[in-house]
């Protein structure tokens, strides 16, 4: 069996690999963003502090997958941020090494029950039966399984790792390779990108922001960007 949990085939070549229904839930979608995922982390931190999110689920791909995981954390957000930035990123040049360090930090300090994983929907692009499919996962067995899915959702061959990455024995690639790697096959009313508050400063949480080319310009390079500064800038821009 290639997939686990409840399998729902929807339109747009999307397979939902989930444990729970989302039809009655509000959705926040979070885009890919490369290293600027740290900027989106600042946005998400502000959201958690200032908006009631208990009725929302979080659907993201690539950097958006990691931020969806953060949004599902039950408490102690400040500790989580501190653990992430206790990592020395000075000589870390690739997203793969960043992901490995973040995975280690999270697993060393948290357990599965510290997160509401049933609220997390991670978009991936899977190669199966000689074609690409968008696969959305929600049926995580534990925290490590969810993190491994985040890594798969962020995998770009030869950029974030080796040529292939397998998640649940399937060749898995960056969810950003899919047009709409989100739970209902479209952007939600709240769609977070690295340029979200730049475009919506006067209209918070209203309607989707269109993807901006700047969302992807720092995908492969962080040499001009301090990750902590990007996080702080995202938090400040959200105010």
Sequence positions of predicted segments:
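Patatin-like phospholipase
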Residues: 1-59, 69-239
């Amino acid at each position: 069996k290639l997939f686990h949990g409840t399998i729902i085939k929807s339109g747009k070549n999307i397979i939902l690999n989930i444990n729970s229904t989302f039809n009655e839930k509000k959705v926040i979608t979070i885009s890919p963003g490369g290293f600027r995922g740290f900027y989106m982390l600042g946005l998400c931190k502000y959201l958690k502090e200032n908006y009631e999110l208990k009725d929302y689920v979080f659907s993201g791909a690539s950097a958006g997958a990691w931020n969806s995981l953060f949004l599902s954390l039950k408490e102690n957000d400040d500790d989580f941020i501190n653990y992430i930035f206790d990592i020395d990123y000075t000589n870390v040049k690739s997203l793969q090494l960043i992901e490995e360090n973040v995975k280690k930090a999270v697993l060393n300090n948290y357990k599965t029950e510290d997160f509401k994983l049933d609220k997390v929907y991670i978009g991936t692009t899977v190669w199966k039966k000689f074609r690409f499919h968008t696969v959305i996962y929600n049926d995580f067995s534990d925290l490590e399984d969810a993190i491994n899915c985040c890594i798969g959702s962020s995998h770009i061959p030869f950029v974030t790792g080796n040529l292939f990455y397998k998640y649940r024995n399937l060749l898995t690639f960056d969810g950003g390779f899919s047009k709409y790697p989100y739970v209902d096959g479209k952007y939600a009313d709240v769609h977070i990108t690295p340029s979200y508050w730049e475009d919506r400063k006067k209209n918070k949480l209203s309607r989707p922001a269109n993807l901006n080319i700047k969302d992807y310009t720092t995908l492969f390079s962080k040499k001009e960007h301090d990750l902590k500064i990007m996080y702080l800038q995202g938090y400040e821009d959200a105010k």
